[in-house]
Amino acid sequence: MKFKLVPEAPETLAFVADAQRAVPLVPGSEDDCCARLMRRLDFPSRDVARTWLTFLRAVELADETDDGSFVRQDTDPTPDHLRDAFVRRIYGASDVLALLDSEPKSVSEVFEGFEERVPVWEHHRAAESWQDVWTERVERMLAWSVLLGLAERREGGYVAAEHA
């Protein structure tokens, strides 16, 4: 399963651990989990909290149970774990990374290379703004890639990380 929602990248990976700790060990409803995330991490809205909850599921730090409640996973959010889960489970992450090389590319240039991978149904779902929505998603994937050491930000754009 691949996930599309990616929150804005935080300043440090320690924030991911804080977000994971905000998800209960005892299963809770989506509303309860979002309220906890908002309270503990000062998220400005339920939408931001829900995006983080979805992202935590994507990177295998939280899970949705069969009854629709959410629970924290007993997985350490190490950089290696986060890199692996990000590339495997975030829709488009591996494609975005494959577009990077040693020449800096702007967000627009990366989106241009990625655009054909946007599912057709997404074009109809947000007909007037799908390109804006997906450009923002690409930008967020790039920011997370930098945070995770999979890419580097240089003058003029993003490049593949030398060790990635």
PLM regions and their residue ranges:
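Donor-sugar nucleotide-binding helix/loop cap in glycosyltransferases
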Residues: 1-164
